[in-house]
């Protein structure tokens, strides 16, 4: 069902490569425990949600010049949300920070097997050199207070911090003093409450 929904919503994507990516996750999950998603749920909460929410986040960026966007995905694990988005938008400049070595190895494998070009940093985001990213994002990595701390040294003015969250985001905002995140609900077709906590660094 959700595999077909992905095809219907994103007809111009490289569906063959997306299927290969899903198959690699299913195969590698047996040994590496990459994600709890499998089967139709993998297509729903892994693939569709990633592409849909990343499209939404990119829409929050003021990109009148239509420049190549530089995106950092923190703790992508098996590649969510950035890899499905990269497959559908190969023109972006993607960097992934992933500290778990087995997941890093998986990301290296998919880069080679799917011929995907992205920068992979196999260490915690706190240890990477500051770079000018247009967007810094993460999904299911940490609460807003922690995300605020670990990204503090690596963002620049005008960087968009945009984190994919569930309904608990409202409690996280209350606990993150002086963080000043805005919350927006992402209307979607998978009957799931998805929110984006975002702000532009001043």
UniProtKB/Swiss-Prot annotation:
SUPFAM superfamilies linked to this entry: S-adenosyl-L-methionine-dependent methyltransferases
Molecular function in Gene Ontology: rRNA (guanine-N7-)-methyltransferase activity
Gene3D superfamilies given in the database record: Vaccinia Virus protein VP39
Binding-site residues for S-adenosyl-L-methionine, renumbered to this chain: 75, 80, 125-126, 139
InterPro entries referenced in this protein's UniProt entry, alphabetically: rRNA_ssu_MeTfrase_G, SAM-dependent_MTases_sf
UniProt xrefs under Pfam families: GidB
Its EC number(s): 2.1.1.-
Localization annotation: Cytoplasm
GO cellular component: cytosol
Endoplasmic reticulum as UniProt keyword: no
Main location group: cytoplasm
Keyword line: Cytoplasm, Methyltransferase, rRNA processing, S-adenosyl-L-methionine, Transferase
The protein's enzyme class: transferase
Endoplasmic reticulum among keywords: no
UniProt cross-references to NCBIfam families, sorted A to Z: rsmG_gidB
Known role: Specifically methylates the N7 position of a guanine in 16S rRNA.
Similarity annotation: Belongs to the methyltransferase superfamily. RNA methyltransferase RsmG family.
Protein name (database record): Ribosomal RNA small subunit methyltransferase G
Gene: rsmG
């Amino acid at each position: 069902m959700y595999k077909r929904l992905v095809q219907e919503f994103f007809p111009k994507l490289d569906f063959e490569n997306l299927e290969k990516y899903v198959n690699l996750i299913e195969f590698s999950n047996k040994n590496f425990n990459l994600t709890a998603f499998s089967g139709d749920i993998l297509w729903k909460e892994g693939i569709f949600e990633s592409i849909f929410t990343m499209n939404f986040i990119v829409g929050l960026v003021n990109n009148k010049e239509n420049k190549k966007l530089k995106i950092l995905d923190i703790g992508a694990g098996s590649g969510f949300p950035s890899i499905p988005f990269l497959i559908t938008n190969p023109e972006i400049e993607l960097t992934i920070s992933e500290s778990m070595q087995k997941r890093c190895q998986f990301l290296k494998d998919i880069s080679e097997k799917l011929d995907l070009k992205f920068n992979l940093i196999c260490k915690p985001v706190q240890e990477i050199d500051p770079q000018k990213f247009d967007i810094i994002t993460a999904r299911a990595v940490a609460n807003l207070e922690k995300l605020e701390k670990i990204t503090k040294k690596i963002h620049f003015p005008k960087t968009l911090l945009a984190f994919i969250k569930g309904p608990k985001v409202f409690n996280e905002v209350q606990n993150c003093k002086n963080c000043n995140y805005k919350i927006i609900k992402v209307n979607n077709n998978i009957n799931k409450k998805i929110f984006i906590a975002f702000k532009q660094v001043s």
